[in-house]
């Protein structure tokens, strides 16, 4: 069954790879974004709606932490404070 195939012959899909890993020249290393709240010692607050506007999109959605660079702890707190500000009518739920 496998006698026709040479044991030392590699599969054609692995010809351009070295040791199973392909070198990708298009890959760029990105600097990890630091959390604005951890660096400054400031905590998100619903009353500071001008600062909270930086963390929502034009449509009014909360930006994810991979874009804002906040830590998981502060992202959860930020989402809570944005929701409080929306409830208090300091921030809109949806922008037109």
Curated annotation (Swiss-Prot):
It comes from the Bacteria. One of its GO terms (biological process) is translation. Binds as a heterodimer with protein bS6 to the central domain of the 16S rRNA, where it helps stabilize the platform of the 30S subunit. Belongs to the bacterial ribosomal protein bS18 family. GO terms for cellular component: cytosolic small ribosomal subunit. The keyword Ribonucleoprotein applies. This is Small ribosomal subunit protein bS18. Part of the 30S ribosomal subunit. Forms a tight heterodimer with protein bS6. Keywords: Ribonucleoprotein, Ribosomal protein, RNA-binding, rRNA-binding. NCBIfam families: S18 (TIGR00165). GO terms for molecular function: small ribosomal subunit rRNA binding; structural constituent of ribosome. PANTHER family: 30S RIBOSOMAL PROTEIN S18 (PTHR13479), SMALL RIBOSOMAL SUBUNIT PROTEIN BS18M (PTHR13479:SF40).
